[in-house]
């Protein structure tokens, strides 16, 4: 029984990734450099932590969509459904960012001469989403506490300077994530700032165009 209990505990290496992942917010370069180790053993060690980060970021992302702001406009919608909807929608967003976003980053890096793997590109995207994951525990609780259910329907008291401030902080989290992605590309490839920015810009061009197109309709 003791042996079974010990084997169920996270090893020091596994625990280190649960500490490394949040550390990307304050000391990103060493965390990203650790992604250079792509041995199967090391990839397995960090997988759970990275998927947790991008999963939380996905929930934060879905809460900021126009759909969320009008969710309760439907009379049949219930407040109790919002957490379930946010979780499922966040999971979808996280998977899309991880697989599609990772693929776009991988393709952009290869285009500019990178030799890294698709798996490492996905890990970069996951780690870079840490600011959005952080906003789920900092920005969103305060925003929901201030505006309550009015945040999820139109015509409430959630419009005005205060809401624009929260919106600005939310978009700042996206900007922070983009900056971390540039730092991550530079760290794992050993590239210049210009080449790293170009890689992230090329990878994000298609998603940006799609978002702009959806806004114009």
Where are these regions (language model features)?
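N-terminal juxtamembrane cytosolic/stromal segments of multi-pass membrane proteins
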Residues: 1-60
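Hydrophobic alpha-helical transmembrane segments and adjacent short intramembrane/lumenal linkers
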Residues: 105-106, 114-216
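Membrane-helix interface/capping segments
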Residues: 70-74, 101-115
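Membrane-interface interhelical loops and short amphipathic "cap" helices
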Residues: 68-85, 148-159, 217
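Hydrophobic alpha-helical transmembrane segments of multi-pass integral membrane proteins
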Residues: 50-64, 96, 100, 177
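Juxtamembrane "helix exit" motif at the C-terminal ends of alpha-helical transmembrane segments
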Residues: 58-73, 211-214
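Hydrophobic alpha-helical transmembrane segments
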Residues: 50-52, 87-92, 99, 122-125, ...
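Hydrophobic alpha-helical transmembrane segments of multi-pass membrane proteins
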Residues: 18, 88-96, 165-175
